[in-house]
């Protein structure tokens, strides 16, 4: 998955951001499920990357609410 930057997120519509957030949360759930079943993630840094992207999306959402 492509790393999202704040500038790219701000250019998205609200619906696009919501859909991206939903997809990222599903990806995070999938990665955590793989690890919990005893498997190892193909890329260990992927969980961290997904969490940071979710945080960026939520930060931009909160900035726009103000």
UniProtKB/Swiss-Prot annotation:
PROSITE patterns, per database record: RIBOSOMAL_L29
Family, per entry: Belongs to the universal ribosomal protein uL29 family.
Swiss-Prot/TrEMBL keywords: Ribonucleoprotein, Ribosomal protein
Name of the protein: Large ribosomal subunit protein uL29
InterPro entries tied to this protein: Ribosomal_uL29, Ribosomal_uL29_CS, Ribosomal_uL29_sf
Transmembrane feature ranges: none
Top-level lineage group: Archaea
HAMAP family per the UniProt record, alphabetical: Ribosomal_uL29
Pfam families named among the record's database cross-references: Ribosomal_L29
Record organism: Thermoplasma volcanium (strain ATCC 51530 / DSM 4299 / JCM 9571 / NBRC 15438 / GSS1)
One Gene Ontology molecular-function label: structural constituent of ribosome
Family annotation (CDD domains): Ribosomal_L29_HIP
A GO BP entry: translation
GO cellular component assignments: ribonucleoprotein complex; ribosome
